[in-house]
Regions:
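Acidic, histidine-bearing metal-coordination/catalytic regions of metal-dependent phosphoesterases
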Residues: 21-151, 156, 170-171
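Positively charged n-region of N-terminal signal peptides that target proteins for export
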Residues: 1-4
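Active-site neighborhood of divalent metal-dependent phosphoester/pyrophosphate hydrolases
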Residues: 108, 112-116, 142-206
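Hydrophobic alpha-helix-in-membranes signature
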Residues: 15-18, 173
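Bacterial N-terminal signal peptides
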Residues: 6-16
Length: 206
């Protein structure tokens, strides 16, 4: 009987974890992309595959390892409470004008949400800074007197046209790109937004 029980335990231990008992992980679904880049900050927006709590970590672009020291964290929060959801908006502030920074986006899946009573979060996941360099961003200089922006409109969901229009942006580096209107024929879902132009905007402009 003991041998049978021992073999049963060994067999169960060798089985892969059932999806029903495995913890969900929040991965990046779309983005990131930047908005409202000012002399002292910027806003990062992205979506995740499941409800999550999110934050952004920043470091100066000074050649050091991103985690050489503990980096400041900026949370997606409102009135001191962290927002939970699939769409994340994090404002990074307190930066210096005319300086280049690196940033990393992070998120933790919501395992249990009991409202004001308790929220249980899973393991943290984020943009891969081992295989790819952290995302760069440069704050505008305080003494500049001109800027360059590009405007795109009326592509009506033709992502290939959008990519042609902004394809040279990584080389020419406009200060920002204005997405003006009629970029889709209709907006039925977040997926349509990313497939229509936002995925390409994130790839080419971030």
């Amino acid at each position: 009987m003991k041998n049978t029980l021992f073999l049963l335990i060994c067999f169960l231990a060798s089985l892969p974890a059932s999806p029903a008992f495995s913890q969900p992980s929040a991965r990046i679904a779309g983005g990131p992309y930047l908005q409202n880049v000012t002399e002292d900050g910027f806003t990062v927006i992205w979506t995740t595959t499941t409800d999550a709590a999110a934050w952004v970590e920043t470091a100066p672009d000074d050649g050091t390892h991103f985690y050489a020291v503990e980096r400041p964290k900026y949370y997606d929060s409102h009135l001191g409470r962290r927002r939970l959801g699939k769409l994340h908006r994090v404002r990074v502030g307190g930066l210096e004008p005319g300086k280049t920074y690196r940033y990393r986006i992070m998120q933790q899946a919501v395992l249990s949400d009991e409202g004001n009573k308790r929220v249980v979060l899973g393991e943290g996941y984020g943009s891969d800074i081992l295989k790819h360099a952290p995302y760069p961003v440069t704050t505008p200089s305080a003494d500049r007197n001109e800027l360059e922006f590009w405007m795109v409109n009326d592509i009506h969901g033709r992502d290939s046209v959008f990519r042609l229009l902004i394809g040279d942006a990584p080389r020419q580096k406009p200060d920002f790109v204005c997405l003006n209107g009629d970029l889709l024929n209709s907006i039925e879902s977040e997926k349509a937004l990313f497939e229509g132009f936002l995925a390409s905007a994130s790839e080419l402009l971030t």
